[in-house]
Amino acid sequence: MDDQLIDRSYFTTLYKQIRLQEFLEVAHTILQDRLENGFGKTVKGVPLGCLPVELFREHFSTFRYWRSYTKERPAFINNEKVMVQHLYFTFNARSGFPTLSSGKEWVKKKVEKKDSNNPADVAIHEYQKVTFIISIRDTRVECDFKMATNTPGSEQAQQQQQQQQQQQLGDIPIKQQITSSNNSGNSQQQQPQQQQQQQQQQQQQQQQPQQQQQQQQPQQQQHLQQQHQQQVQQLQQQQLQQQQLQQQQLQQQQLQQQQLQQPQLQQMQQPQQQQQQQQPQYTPQQLMQFQQMQQAQQQQQQAQQLQQQMGSSPTHSSPTIKQEGLTGYTQIPQGGIINTNTNLNGTGGVSPNQPMPNSSPILPTNASSVVPPVVSPPLPTSNNNSNNLGTTSPQQSNSSEISHQPIVPLNP
């Protein structure tokens, strides 16, 4: 940090107001330096006012007491060795680590004018230096503020020094002109100095509320962040509650719909069950008979088509097939079927020309009750006709042979 020329009033207000704050800021730089560069380092010119103070405020909040002492040290001012009285303020923490020190140096050098006895010509040059020192073990940090105040005659002393240098170079006429002009301007320079001091005091007063505001800003920001987090949490809780309520309402609606649909389903199922009960239930035997009837009808239709193709007359009856029974012959039309199965009630199966309902015609099963013979035209007979009555040859028993003789039952 470059040296800053300030007046005494600025130093006093600065020292009283921001002493601890600047110490804490410098302590931050020390810790960083120890981590980066190791031990035994000396850091000078640390910039102040640009580091977060609140990081280290807690570490230095347990100070017990202050201790002050003075010590004289040599210093070189204008290439002259001068003893300086250094005033230290030391802050001791409970643990004794770290030790914070601040000191201020007062350097007064009096320059007298040898040519005249006028007190206005006496030049007093005053230096004031403040050093903030923080020592942590073997690490030392120094931050300096350099101040210079000019008392009446200080400018003359500076001019005299310039004149002495000029005398060595042989410029005597220039020296006389400078001394005459400086005497006339001393009275005019005092007024601007007072005005500058007043302006600086006003600036210091304006800086105080700004510093307070800067300290309050982080606290306000933290408070606002906490409020924002609380609001976010409340909103999340409300959303969860709303979701739970919606789920409960959906479940209730589903239960109500199921309860309403159950009687409707029962009503829909009842007529279906009644229809199933009303439908007739056929046995496997009846189904087989129904299939055989369908096949017989198909065969009969095929036979009729063949007769039409052969040019047979419509008066001829369909050929019959002779079937040998136990008690006699039964004449079965080709493609037809006789149901010999009887139910418990004595009724037969389904007729070939009608469907399956219970009102199917009943066919007798006795050998005497046979299908009435179909009249066919007489054929020439031979001597063996009498012997062939009631008997059939193996060839006639074949289902493919057609008989043109009338079938007479054995048991009339």
Curated annotation (Swiss-Prot):
Domain of life: Eukaryota
Biased composition (Polar residues): 177-187, 310-321, 350-363
Region (Disordered) location: 150-171, 177-196, 302-412
Ranges annotated as biased composition (Low complexity): 156-168, 335-345, 364-373, 381-394
Name used for this protein in its record: Uncharacterized protein DDB_G0285291
